[in-house]
């Protein structure tokens, strides 16, 4: 069982996943105090490179609402999360995707991240797993880059959704109507832009799994919103959800960058020397 300390932003968890509760998600906010999802079993489809907060925060809310949650992946053992571009915790996998069926679950959650959905969308087993949920009209919740998986599964034609703004064109090209709003609900699908919209996403996700009506602002529209003029605001908002970088990690990134530059210079040394020699002879 996972408990969210109201207003404190701290989690106490007896599960295998250590969860950092986002500061603005409380028991009342997620409506988990009423145990809306008791008896439900939710599959979380994730691979290495999942965005940590996009898995841990929704999973904690689901468990607090009474749901049983399984982590499903492409491999057994553990998978590595990310805090944006930095490695985060390992979490244990409950089942591999070839060991389970959509019929075993009441709903599906697909977290985002840069790497995770790219790996999932290249797996035929993952695509089939996701496709089966839609075929059975079971609820699917995803955010950030997670809708990439839906696109590769061929599920977006005629749908209305949102995603990380940077993949807006991918969604439109897959046949979807893309909206630049916190959360969008279309039938059995709930989507959100990213960590900056975690609170409305979690609320709507629980409503979806519980069979409740869509909230105001989550309803579909007919035409896609335009591309953004600048990524600055939404990127900065998402960064506020990320843990502070430890000094060691920052130093490691600096050393890695220096190493890449050194290797690049060494590899280009001969070409640079030749150019310089040619210039000197002219």
Language model region names:
Residues 2-6, 14-136, 148-155, 170-180, ...:
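Extended, subdomain-level signal for the structured scaffold at the beginning of enzyme domains
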Residues 68-74, 143, 160-163:
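Short internal beta-strands
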Residues 137-143:
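ADP-ribose/adenylate-binding Rossmann-like module
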Residues 154, 163-164:
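Catalytic cores of processing enzymes, dominated by hydrolases/peptidases
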């Amino acid at each position: 069982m996972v408990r969210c300390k109201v207003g404190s932003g701290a989690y106490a968890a007896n599960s295998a996943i250590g969860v950092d509760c986002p500061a603005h998600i409380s028991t009342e906010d997620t409506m988990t105090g009423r145990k809306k999802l008791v008896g439900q079993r939710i599959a979380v489809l994730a691979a290495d490179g999942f965005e940590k907060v996009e898995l841990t925060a929704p999973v904690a809310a689901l468990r607090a609402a009474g749901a049983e949650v399984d982590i499903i992946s492409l491999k057994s053992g553990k998978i590595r999360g990310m805090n944006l571009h930095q490695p985060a915790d390992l979490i244990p996998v409950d089942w591999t995707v070839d060991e389970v069926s959509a019929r075993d679950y009441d709903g599906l959650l697909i977290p985002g991240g840069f790497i995770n959905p790219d790996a999932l969308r290249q797996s035929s087993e993952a695509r089939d797993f996701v496709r089966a949920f839609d075929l059975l009209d079971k609820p699917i919740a995803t955010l950030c880059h997670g809708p990439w998986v839906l696109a590769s599964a061929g599920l977006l034609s005629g749908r209305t959704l949102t995603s990380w703004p940077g993949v807006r064109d991918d969604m439109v090209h897959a046949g979807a109507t893309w909206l630049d709003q916190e959360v969008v609900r279309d039938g059995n699908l709930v989507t959100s832009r990213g960590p900056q919209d975690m609170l409305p996403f979690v609320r709507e996700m629980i409503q979806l799994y519980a069979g409740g009506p869509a909230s105001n602002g989550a309803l579909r529209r007919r035409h896609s919103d335009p591309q953004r003029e600048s990524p600055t605001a939404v990127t900065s908002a998402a960064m506020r959800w990320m843990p502070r970088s430890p000094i060691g990690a920052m130093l490691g990134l600096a050393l890695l960058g220096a190493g890449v530059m050194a290797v690049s210079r060494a590899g280009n040394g001969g070409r640079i020397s030749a150019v310089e020699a040619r210039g000197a002879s002219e």
